[in-house]
């Protein structure tokens, strides 16, 4: 049985000649070693591999050796002693051999696959020949060719010999039952370099060193910081790298980064050919930049300078005219800006006036609503239970004040009763104004569990200046709790408020 690609247990087993002579660990039917085979025995102790037993019992229900009756495979017993003893035999690791054997084996496997394909094609041809009624002589020739191919394979397998890699191979001796796990973890296994383009195959324990030096590893350019460059192509990259330092191609002996060379040649290099500064005005001489100063000193450029002065004067005149036009446009813009600012101020004043009228109108509407419909709100008192404990009879607390048409009012509550209402909740409406007011008012203690049980008290009174009116015995204090519905789960008491200012009827005009 194959343990890795083309390898068999015979390739790595130690003392295999001795084991084969004893025939103790070989199936007596198929003559294969019992590596990774399930071994079963008859009642007389004769054993063979599971595959051989199954094939034999399909033909005859008897032992292949002693001929004792075996009705079915279920009548056999597992021969664990033989299996366990063989699993403890020693063997070499497959990676103790040279790489050449792995490569040759891989090539041989490819050849075997090709031969199988050819055989399949031959079989198809044979079927076609039979259908077409060809002679049996062609079949005999094909069979002879197949036999020759098999003989050639056997000869090639005999020629292939495993050669130990004494210097770099795995030297560990392991038990048969540990072979698969060792192969998976062996540090001497053959692996391929992970870098794309590198076909190098080497042992795992030398992979890291190789990959650090591999010509196909990706590196970063030290000049332009470009990454993802293959090591062997780095020199080619330097030929194009914009930050690689090179000498001036015009031989001025200065060095610059490649992307700065163009600017150097156009603006600074003494060996660059340039035109005389008066070239546009008639001096058509070209020279190296280093010779410009000597040219200017040795050649009379007065005529050319005169042309330059004339051109500059003309340009200056045009600039002055443009400046005058721009100044006029600026003055026009200033006038326009002033006019726009004035209109903006007018609009701002108009907007302010509209806003004032709007708010005055809203105030009037709100005052009218309060006058005609009355003031409606609610007073929610938090932590009422603590308030009862901390406000003894006859102390009280005030609600936040509220205004009705510029008149101030407030509600007072006595949790434990006023002077005349001990052990009761007392509620009063206070007129905090110096003028008397005729008021229609309602105070309602809200029952949160059943709104129909809410207690409402109504009054129609004339309040003199700084006076209160209300009820000293609104509800017994001991009844106000969560169970009865007067307090919420978070201990809040709610009082609804309604107050309306009443005015005397206007008397008719008489004459």
UniProtKB/Swiss-Prot annotation:
It holds the Pfam family MATH_2. A zinc finger (TRAF-type) spans 181-234, 236-293. A zinc finger (RING-type) spans 27-67. Disulfide bonds: none annotated. SUPFAM superfamilies: RING/U-box, TRAF domain-like. Keywords: Coiled coil, Cytoplasm, Metal-binding, Repeat, Zinc, Zinc-finger. It comes from the Eukaryota. Residues 107-159 are annotated as: Disordered. Gene3D superfamilies: Apoptosis, Tumor Necrosis Factor Receptor Associated Protein 2, Chain A, Zinc/RING finger domain, C3HC4 (zinc finger). Residues 103-169, 324-358 form a coiled coil. Signal peptide: none annotated. GO terms for molecular function: zinc ion binding. One of its GO terms (cellular component) is cytoplasm. Residues 374-499 form the MATH domain. It is found in: Cytoplasm. Residues 109-155 have a biased composition (Acidic residues). The MATH/TRAF domain binds to receptor cytoplasmic domains. Probable adapter protein and signal transducer that links members of the tumor necrosis factor receptor family to different signaling pathways by association with the receptor cytoplasmic domain and kinases. Belongs to the TNF receptor-associated factor family. A subfamily. This is TNF receptor-associated factor family protein DDB_G0290931. It comes from Dictyostelium discoideum (Social amoeba).
